[in-house]
């Protein structure tokens, strides 16, 4: 017979005391592992990260932070800077460049996106608490003193407000304040375009206090004060980012001496766009103008049309090239190249005009017949052909009646710049160059390409290496 305090089931005997102990153990396990008794909702699984690192932090009562802020702001005057009347307020600045670009050469400005940070000490914001730092949102910015920093060379500046104002405020228990904000600035950059498009520029970003001179506020750079992001995402297009440097200077004005902080971004222009759009087309047009030297001189419409077409094309190219530049009063490197190309093209047209003029104005055959019928009382002592020794080479100069024209004293001339077949023997023509009109195209075929190649050699060496 079993005891009244025990009961049995089959062959197992259970005691009420044992049952109570088991119940307590089960409740304890369930309290330690609530996941066994509660089912996670879909929202819980969405926020759950399997690789999340859990950090234990001391729990700060919300009421304590509120009390600290109320105590700090009680009697606080945000119109007065820290240590007013005692010493200047030292502000440490640093900057993170998110992106630069594009650069607008016509308006001489560039766009930059930065995170700008300022740090200073305000003894009025010291507090005693286990909390070392108060991480506050932008609502607290207007309740404490903030430096009146402005960007001196900005044409336009925008703060980011989506989805909330991109501003951050931190207050440490020793009175240190950190204030950061994100800005997009269109800053002025005076471009010197003498070497365009092989130019390099240093575009500044300058900031200082608007109303406090250096007796009131002093700016100072932090270590590693300017950092840059991934330059591959920058929209510089025609430029390459070379580097940066930061400086500090004092600017004297009628209202006082101000500490001005500057960051210079060094940019180098890429020539690819202008090589394709300007340099190669201009070179090809110049070479095309030389084709007229191989066309028969009697083909007046063909040579004239080619010359005029190349001149008009060069005029169009020079106009298009100027559209990407501001209206500066000096000559740029590209202006020089385009102008010289225009001169070569125009000279090719003038060359044919000169050749055609002297050839077409030769003496008519009827006049020659009249001269033969009524010969003048003169003695012809000119030889039909003459052998001239020049530069150790023998040249046979023959009179070419086809290209003769009326010259001094009614004499027929077969050469340009000379009125006798043997120009070297004429004392009044001593030192003159003997050029045959019929060979002007032959001379041009050599002179024009040689001169253009020499110009390119001097041009590219001067602008790229000197």
UniProtKB/Swiss-Prot annotation:
Allosterically activated by benzodiazepines. Activated by pentobarbital. Inhibited by the antagonist bicuculline. Inhibited by zinc ions. Potentiated by histamine. It is found in: Postsynaptic cell membrane; Cell membrane; Cell projection, Dendrite; Cytoplasmic vesicle membrane. CDD domains: LGIC_ECD_GABAAR_G, LGIC_TM_GABAAR_gamma. The keyword Phosphoprotein does not apply. The keyword ATP-binding does not apply. Palmitoylated by ZDHHC3/GODZ; required for the accumulation of GABA(A) receptors at the postsynaptic membrane of inhibitory GABAergic synapses. The chain crosses the membrane at residues 275-295, 302-321, 334-358, 443-463. It catalyses: chloride(in) = chloride(out). Residues 296-301, 359-442 are cytoplasmic. One of its GO terms (cellular component) is postsynapse. Residues 39-274, 322-333, 464-466 are extracellular. Glycans are attached at residues 51, 128, 246. Gamma subunit of the heteropentameric ligand-gated chloride channel gated by gamma-aminobutyric acid (GABA), a major inhibitory neurotransmitter in the brain. GABA-gated chloride channels, also named GABA(A) receptors (GABAAR), consist of five subunits arranged around a central pore and contain GABA active binding site(s) located at the alpha and beta subunit interface(s). When activated by GABA, GABAARs selectively allow the flow of chloride anions across the cell membrane down their electrochemical gradient. This is Gamma-aminobutyric acid receptor subunit gamma-2. It comes from Rattus norvegicus. The gene is Gabrg2.
């Amino acid at each position: 017979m079993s005891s009244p305090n025990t009961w049995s089931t089959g062959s197992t005997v259970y005691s009420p005391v044992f049952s109570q102990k088991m119940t307590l153990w089960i409740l304890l396990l369930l309290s330690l592992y609530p996941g066994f008794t509660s089912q996670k909702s879909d929202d819980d699984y969405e926020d759950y990260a399997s690789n999340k690192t859990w950090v234990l932090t001391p729990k700060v009562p919300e009421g304590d932070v509120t009390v600290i802020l109320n105590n700090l702001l009680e009697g606080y005057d945000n119109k007065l800077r820290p240590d007013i009347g005692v010493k200047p307020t030292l502000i440490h600045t640093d900057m993170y460049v998110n992106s630069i670009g594009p650069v607008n050469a016509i308006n001489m400005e560039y766009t930059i996106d930065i995170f700008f940070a300022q740090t200073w000490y305000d003894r009025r914001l010291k507090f005693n608490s286990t909390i070392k730092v108060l991480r506050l949102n932008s609502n607290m910015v207007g309740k404490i003193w903030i430096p009146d920093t402005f960007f001196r060379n900005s044409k336009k500046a925008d703060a980011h407000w989506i989805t909330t104002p991109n501003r951050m405020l931190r207050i440490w228990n020793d009175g240190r304040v950190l204030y950061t904000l994100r800005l997009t600035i269109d800053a002025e950059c005076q471009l010197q375009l003498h070497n365009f498009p092989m130019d390099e520029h240093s575009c500044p970003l300058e900031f200082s206090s608007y109303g406090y001179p250096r007796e009131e506020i002093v700016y100072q750079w932090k270590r590693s004060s300017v950092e840059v992001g991934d330059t591959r995402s920058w929209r510089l297009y025609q430029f390459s980012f070379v580097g940066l440097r930061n400086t500090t200077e004092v600017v004297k004005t009628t209202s006082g001496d101000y500490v001005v902080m500057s960051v210079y971004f060094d940019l180098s222009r890429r020539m690819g766009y202008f090589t394709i759009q300007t340099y190669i087309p201009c070179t090809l047009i110049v070479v095309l103008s030389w084709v007229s030297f191989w066309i028969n001189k009697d083909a007046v419409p063909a040579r004239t049309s080619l010359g005029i077409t190349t001149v008009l094309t060069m005029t169009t190219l020079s106009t298009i090239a100027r559209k990407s530049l501001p209206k500066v009063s000096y000559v740029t490197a590209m202006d020089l190249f385009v102008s010289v190309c225009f001169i070569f093209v125009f000279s090719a047209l003038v060359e044919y005009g000169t050749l055609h003029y002297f050839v077409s104005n030769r003496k008519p055959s009827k006049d020659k017949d009249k001269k033969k019928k009524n010969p003048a009382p003169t003695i012809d002592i000119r030889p039909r052909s003459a052998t001239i020794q020049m530069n150790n080479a023998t040249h046979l100069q023959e009179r070419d009646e086809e290209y003769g024209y009326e010259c001094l004293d009614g004499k027929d001339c077969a050469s340009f710049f000379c009125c006798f077949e043997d120009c070297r023997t004429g004392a009044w023509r001593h030192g003159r160059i003997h050029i045959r009109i019929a060979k002007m195209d032959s001379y041009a075929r050599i002179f024009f390409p040689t001169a253009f190649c020499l110009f390119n050699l001097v041009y590219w060496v001067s602008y790229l290496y000197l």
